[in-house]
């Protein structure tokens, strides 16, 4: 079977995706994947036009010709070239030909790849090396350089392909071995799922199987180790957790994350606490959620939800272009300065990076200001949750945790990658409906953040302090209170084997 560039790229992201593509299976669709495909094609066309402007028909050809007499070839650029060998195939975006500089010196052939992103990845470089390998074998001569043109500025990166050739060769061997059988590779969910056309298919199958890869953060090594002892499902893993008494010298240090405890929380549908996590907010909470385009390091929407004396205000700071970024940062600082003792609450590293970059680009507020104090001590809820609070959810993502708490987004498909599609769509058409979808998604994230914060304040309340809602006490389990016992003692059936 021919290994195409399309199949090779899929394997780099996920073996299952590679297998499904090789069998021409149709995906259920993915808005982000569809958008990337459309934008990539448009970017390729624009890039080709830039390269060919002013060139004669002799200088640019639409296919690789004259391979038998490469020295006398007149063209300098071949477009959309189908390169093939016995088992490899790649539709190369363009091939640049640099004529020989004298007798005995061969012309150079450089495969060119157009990439929409500003920030390149290892996958992009491996794909360039794959193009070079196929072209080299087709021409019967070394191809030592690949070229990637990428991003809004059409930047150029040269890839030294010989250092990647061995790896590409080994990967193609693995792909060939996998595709030589009809056995579907093990289903493993990963970070690429959100960008894949097979996302809903694989997610459904993983849930049906109660597959271990549903647990976010479980590494391949950890999964294989569990598989080696007969543990393949989340439920099976849950029976392996055993509470242990920590040495006194370690009691003030945070425990490592236990995937088995998360599995137990899911099985029992209860929140489990490790140690004595505590979240107290001494001041007025400002629930912050920022939207941006990571590939461009551009932040275009700051949402801030503030509750004062029972009334809620939702602030929306929108940037039409990168020139407006400084303005919305200044407006945000002004909002903070108008709040009595503000406490910034956010979820994850995205906002942490946002603070650092805004300080670096535009400076911070005066040292003695209210805003400066708030920015020095923001509360990242994920640092409170990680390895201390185990929700009965597969991940610690805001959406999963808030859904468990009973919150629902008005658009169930709204997500971080979907927001990227919305923003790019808005930039092209300036449709107010698209902008409103982004603003609403951001506002609902802020609302979900408030709900999760209130829940954490409640469930991490120190012992001895009266609880606001004691009715939910049975839904929270302290690991320290769990009975320590040897699992599967004599006469007890092992549930893992069931």
PLM features per residue range, with description:
Residues 82-88, 288-297, 302:
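An active-site-proximal beta-strand-loop segment
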Residues 223-297, 313-314, 334, 478-484, ...:
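Long, highly charged low-complexity segments
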Residues 1-106:
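Metal-dependent nuclease catalytic cores that hydrolyze phosphodiester bonds in DNA/RNA
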Residues 26, 205-214:
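Short cysteine/histidine-rich zinc-coordinating motifs and their immediately flanking basic loops
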Residues 287, 460-498:
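Accessory, charged alpha-helical segments in nucleic-acid-processing enzymes
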Residues 147-154, 158-209, 229, 401-469:
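Acidic, Mg2+-coordinating catalytic module of metal-dependent nucleases/exonucleases
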């Amino acid at each position: 079977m021919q290994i195409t560039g399309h199949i090779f790229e899929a394997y780099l992201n996920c073996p299952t995706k590679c297998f499904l593509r090789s069998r021409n299976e149709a995906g259920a669709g993915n808005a982000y994947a569809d958008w990337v495909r459309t934008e990539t094609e448009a970017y390729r066309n624009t890039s080709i036009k830039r390269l060919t402007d002013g060139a004669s028909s002799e200088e640019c050809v639409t296919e690789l010709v004259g391979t038998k007499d490469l020295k006398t070839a007149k063209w300098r650029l071949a477009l959309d070239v189908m390169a093939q060998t016995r088992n490899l195939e790649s539709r190369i975006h363009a091939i640049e030909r640099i004529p020989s500089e004298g007798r005995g010196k061969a012309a150079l052939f450089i495969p060119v790849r157009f990439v929409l992103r500003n920030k390149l990845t290892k996958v992009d470089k491996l794909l360039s090396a794959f193009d070079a390998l196929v072209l080299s074998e087709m021409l019967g001569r070394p191809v030592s350089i690949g070229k990637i043109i990428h991003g809004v500025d059409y930047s150029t990166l040269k890839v030294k392909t010989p250092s990647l050739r061995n790896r590409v060769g080994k990967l193609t061997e693995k792909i060939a071995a996998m595709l030589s059988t009809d056995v579907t590779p093990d289903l493993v969910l990963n970070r690429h799922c959100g960008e894949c056309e097979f996302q809903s298919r694989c997610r459904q199958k993983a849930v049906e199987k109660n597959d271990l890869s549903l647990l976010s953060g479980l590494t391949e090594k950890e999964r294989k180790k569990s598989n080696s002892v007969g543990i393949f499902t989340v439920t099976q893993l849950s029976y392996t957790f055993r509470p242990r008494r920590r040495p006194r010298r370690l009691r003030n240090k945070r425990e490592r994350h236990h995937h088995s405890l998360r599995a137990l929380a899911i099985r029992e549908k209860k929140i489990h606490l490790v140690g004595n996590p505590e979240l107290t907010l001494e001041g007025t909470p400002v629930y912050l959620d920022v939207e941006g385009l990571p590939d461009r390091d551009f932040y275009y929407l700051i949402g801030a939800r503030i509750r004062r004396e029972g009334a809620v205000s939702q602030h929306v700071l929108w940037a039409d272009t990168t020139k407006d970024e400084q303005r919305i940062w200044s407006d945000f600082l002004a909002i903070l300065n108008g709040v009595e003792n503000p406490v910034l609450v956010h979820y994850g590293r995205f906002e942490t990076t946002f603070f650092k970059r805004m300080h670096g680009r535009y400076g911070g507020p005066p040292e003695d200001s209210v805003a400066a104090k708030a920015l020095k001590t923001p509360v990242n809820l994920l640092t409170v949750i990680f390895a201390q609070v185990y929700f009965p959810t597969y991940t610690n993502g805001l959406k999963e945790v808030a859904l468990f708490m009973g919150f629902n987004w008005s658009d169930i498909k709204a997500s971080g990658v979907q927001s990227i599609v919305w923003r790019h769509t808005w930039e092209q058409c300036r449709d107010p409906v698209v902008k409103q979808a982004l603003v609403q998604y951001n506002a609902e994230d802020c609302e979900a953040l408030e709900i999760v914060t209130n829940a954490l304040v409640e469930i991490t309340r120190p012992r001895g302090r009266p609880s606001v809602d004691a009715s939910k006490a049975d839904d929270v389990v302290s690991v320290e209170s769990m009975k320590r016992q040897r699992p599967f003692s004599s006469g007890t059936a092992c549930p893992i084997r069931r």
